[in-house]
C-alpha cells in the first residue's frame, strides 16, 4: 500500500526540474568588455528590493601580487538615510579587456591589514581561469546595510602584470527599495 507524499514527482515536475538545471548550467568563463548583447542571464530582484549597479576600473596590477580597491557607494545612495537600507544578494563579476592575459582573481572581503590574506577569508572568488568569473553572494550579506559595504574592499590578484583600466570590476547589490520623496515641498501663501 503506497502512502501519499513519498517524494515521487510527476512527469511535468521532472521535466521542469531538468529545465531549471539546464538554465543554471550555462556559465560564461570570461566576460569580455564591452559586454556583448545577450551575454549572461538576468536575475530579477525580490519584490520590494531594487538593484544598484556600479563599476570601477582597476589601477595597474603588479604580477603575483594582491591589490585592493575600495568600494564607494553611488552618489544617490550615499545619504545617511540610504546607508541604513538592508542588503540582499550581492553579485561581483569581472570584465576583462581582450588584451588581458594570464589569470585574474577577484574577491570581496573585509579590509585586511595584509591583502594576501583576503583570499583565505573571502566568501567566494571570481576567477578567470576557472568558469567562475562571477561570484554571487546569496546569503553572506543578508541583514547587512549599505553602510556596512563601506567596510569592504575588492581584492584583485593577477598572475601577470596588467595595465591600468584593463580589468573592470562590476558590483551589483540588491537592497531594499529607497523611499524617494515623490512630492514637492508644500508652498504656503
Curated annotation (Swiss-Prot):
The cellular location(s) given in this protein's UniProt record come to:
Virion
Q: Does the keyword RNA-binding apply?
A: yes
Keyword terms: Capsid protein, Ribonucleoprotein, RNA-binding, T=3 icosahedral capsid protein, Viral nucleoprotein, Virion
Tree of life domain: Viruses
Q: Extract the InterPro entries matched here.
A: Bromo_CP (IPR002009)
The protein's matches in Gene3D superfamilies, at most eight in alphabetical order, are given as: Satellite virus coat domain (2.60.120.220)
Q: Where is this region: Disordered?
A: 1-21
Q: Name one GO cellular component term.
A: host cell endoplasmic reticulum
Q: Where is the composition biased (Basic residues)?
A: 11-21
One annotated GO molecular function: RNA binding
Q: Does the keyword Ribonucleoprotein apply?
A: yes
Q: What does this protein do?
A: Capsid protein. Binds specifically to the subgenomic RNA4 to ensure selective packaging.
Family, according to the entry, reads as follows: Belongs to the bromovirus capsid protein family.
Q: What is written about domains in the entry's comments?
A: The N-terminal arginine-rich region binds selectively to subgenomic RNA4.
**Protein's name in the database:** Capsid protein
Instruction: Record the organism.
Output: Brome mosaic virus (BMV)
Lineage, opening ranks? Viruses, Riboviria, Orthornavirae, Kitrinoviricota, Alsuviricetes
Amino acid at each position: 500500500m503506497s502512502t501519499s507524499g513519498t517524494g515521487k514527482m510527476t512527469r511535468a515536475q521532472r521535466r521542469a526540474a531538468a529545465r531549471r538545471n539546464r538554465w543554471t548550467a550555462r556559465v560564461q568563463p570570461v566576460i569580455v568588455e564591452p559586454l556583448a548583447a545577450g551575454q549572461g542571464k538576468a536575475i530579477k530582484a525580490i519584490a520590494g528590493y531594487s538593484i544598484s549597479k556600479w563599476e570601477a576600473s582597476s589601477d595597474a596590477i603588479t604580477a603575483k601580487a594582491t591589490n585592493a580597491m575600495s568600494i564607494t557607494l553611488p552618489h544617490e545612495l550615499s545619504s545617511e538615510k540610504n546607508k541604513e537600507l538592508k542588503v540582499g544578494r550581492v553579485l561581483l563579476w569581472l570584465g576583462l579587456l581582450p588584451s588581458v592575459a594570464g589569470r585574474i582573481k577577484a574577491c570581496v572581503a573585509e579590509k585586511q591589514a595584509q591583502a594576501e590574506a583576503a583570499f583565505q577569508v573571502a566568501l567566494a572568488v571570481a576567477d578567470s581561469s576557472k568558469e567562475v568569473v562571477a561570484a554571487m553572494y546569496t546569503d553572506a550579506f543578508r541583514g547587512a546595510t549599505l553602510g556596512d559595504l563601506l567596510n569592504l574592499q575588492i581584492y584583485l590578484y593577477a598572475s601577470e602584470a596588467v595595465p591600468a583600466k584593463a580589468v573592470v570590476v562590476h558590483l551589483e547589490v540588491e537592497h531594499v527599495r529607497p523611499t524617494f520623496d515623490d512630492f514637492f515641498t508644500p508652498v504656503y501663501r
